[in-house]
UniProtKB/Swiss-Prot annotation:
Primary gene name: rplM
Function comment: This protein is one of the early assembly proteins of the 50S ribosomal subunit, although it is not seen to bind rRNA by itself. It is important during the early stages of 50S assembly.
Membrane-spanning parts: none
Cross-referenced Pfam families: Ribosomal_L13 (PF00572)
A GO CC term assigned to this protein in UniProt: cytosolic large ribosomal subunit
Top-level taxon: Bacteria
Protein name per its UniProtKB record: Large ribosomal subunit protein uL13
Record key words, sorted: Ribonucleoprotein, Ribosomal protein
Family named by the database record: Belongs to the universal ribosomal protein uL13 family.
NCBIfam families linked: rplM_bact
């Protein structure tokens, strides 16, 4: 008789992946990265365990947005004072904080609970082409816009 194996945090083997985001569409990249962070690409996926891998994203400042989102997409934050709602377009956000749109899109695709916060800590986003994680020997992952 076969039994389903339940994964726990001691049995998880995490890999490191590096993705070059130059020229990729933001939403498509975010959904694929969220799936890897969650561990849904593994046959041993368990919903309540952090069984995903670590992901490094490079060139986040050279990401593409489809349609008219560069001018039309707005990012909001509030200063906690009356009338303090601030908004910024995606174009301005890519200039001021180039990693924010990528992190924001991926965080929105993760669970909204403690596990989601833990999974988000496995994501490392950099605006340039360099990263300080060479010691982990990350595997280069090629993603396409399809």
């Amino acid at each position: 008789m076969r039994q389903t194996t339940i994964l726990n945090s001691t049995k998880v083997e995490k890999k490191w992946y590096v993705i070059d985001a130059q020229g990729l569409v933001l939403g498509r990249l975010a959904s694929k990265v969220a799936m890897i962070l969650r561990g849904k690409n593994k046959p041993s996926y368990t919903p309540h365990v952090d069984c995903g891998d670590n992901v490094i994203i490079l060139n986040a400042d050279k990401i593409n947005l489809s349609g008219n989102k560069l001018k039309g997409k707005m990012y909001y934050h509030h200063s906690q004072h009356p009338g303090g709602l601030k908004r910024t377009t995606a174009k301005n956000m890519l200039v001021k904080k180039p990693i924010y749109p990528v992190e924001h899109a991926i965080k929105g695709m993760l669970p909204k609970n403690k596990l989601g916060s833990k999974l988000f800590r496995n994501l490392f986003v950099y605006a340039g082409n360099e990263h300080p994680h060479e010691a982990q020997q990350p595997i280069k992952l090629e993603l396409t816009n399809k």
